[in-house]
């Protein structure tokens, strides 16, 4: 994760301001259209997109509200959701599935005869964290028949991009898709546009991303967005490091105590092994609790956000 200095030449794509300016405004929809077509090259080609209201309400007043980063519609009426997620959340996959239900449900024709035919819905998620230690950085997800291994329903698609895993070298032979991913990941760290990004669309990208060309209001908005991004990241890293240290210390102590207890009852060898196993488990749990306590003390995140970041329940965070 880059923590770009606010005086660098180009904006940090991971900030809320930059992401929505470059991918979520009518003036820059050619940038998003180019990226989308690079994602689906060989399977789909979009001629135009129309931006839609990013705030969606449930069918009833009591249902939860969904706020998308970018929400648009193709010339065929297909819906596309684009999200930038900087922090790991316990139920992020669930949330992305939940969000995709809104474009589905809004297609229902109220008060009319309807045959249930649906337009395609695409969800694209940029992740500034990783799901696991697997080397694959991209995950294309559809409804699949587990018996045959074939796609059962192809109108609902999810593309998850684990950006920390993306380390493909940039060359002149790189695909447009790879060039876009490189630009998105490294934009805030660059002083010049790389020669490999020679396509005209990247001229547009770097023009729109150059901080010096912003109005005073835009520059202030960006710097505030960058500050929030840096504060959040710094707070999270500090809490994680402190929590890990405290968790390891408590885990070792509990492991030794449990090992001695089990050793007396069932023999030293088995007791030590069991003690180490339980101690590691307790240590990991205590590490998460310690991180939660540190995040609560910082006052920068809500209980719900802390729970998502630490894989704890909100009740556990409250009691931490």
Q: Could you tell me what each predicted segment is?
A:
Residues 1-320:
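Elongated, amphipathic alpha-helical interaction scaffolds
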């Amino acid at each position: 994760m880059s923590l770009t200095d606010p005086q660098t030449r180009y904006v940090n794509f991971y900030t809320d301001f930059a992401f929505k300016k470059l991918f979520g405004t009518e003036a820059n929809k050619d940038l998003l259209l180019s990226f989308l077509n690079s994602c689906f090259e060989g399977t789909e080609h979009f001629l135009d997109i129309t931006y839609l209201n990013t705030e969606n309400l449930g069918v009833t007043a009591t249902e939860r509200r969904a706020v998308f980063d970018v929400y648009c519609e193709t010339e065929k009426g297909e819906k596309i959701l684009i999200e930038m997620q900087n922090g790991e959340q316990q139920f992020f996959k669930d949330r992305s599935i939940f969000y995709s239900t809104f474009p589905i449900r809004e297609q229902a024709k109220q008060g009319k005869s309807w045959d249930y035919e649906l337009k395609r819905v695409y969800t694209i998620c940029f992740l500034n964290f990783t799901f696991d230690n697997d080397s694959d950085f991209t995950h294309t997800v559809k409804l699949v028949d587990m018996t045959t291994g074939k796609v059962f329903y192809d109108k609902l698609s999810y593309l998850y991009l684990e950006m920390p895993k993306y380390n493909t070298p940039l060359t002149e032979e790189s695909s447009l898709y790879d060039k876009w991913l490189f630009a998105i990941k490294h934009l805030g760290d660059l002083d010049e546009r790389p020669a490999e990004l020679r396509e005209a669309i990247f001229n547009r990208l770097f023009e729109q991303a150059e901080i010096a060309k912003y109005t005073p209001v835009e520059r202030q908005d960006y710097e505030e967005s960058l500050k929030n991004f840096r504060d959040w990241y710094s707070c999270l890293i500090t809490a994680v490091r402190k929590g890990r240290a405290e968790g390891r210390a408590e885990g070792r102590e509990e492991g030794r105590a449990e090992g001695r207890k089990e050793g007396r009852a069932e023999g030293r060898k088995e007791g030590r092994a069991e003690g180490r196993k339980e101690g590691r488990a307790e240590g990991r749990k205590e590490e998460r609790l310690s991180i939660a306590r540190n995040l609560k003390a910082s006052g920068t995140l809500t209980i719900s956000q802390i729970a998502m970041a630490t894989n704890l329940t909100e009740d556990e965070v409250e009691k931490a």
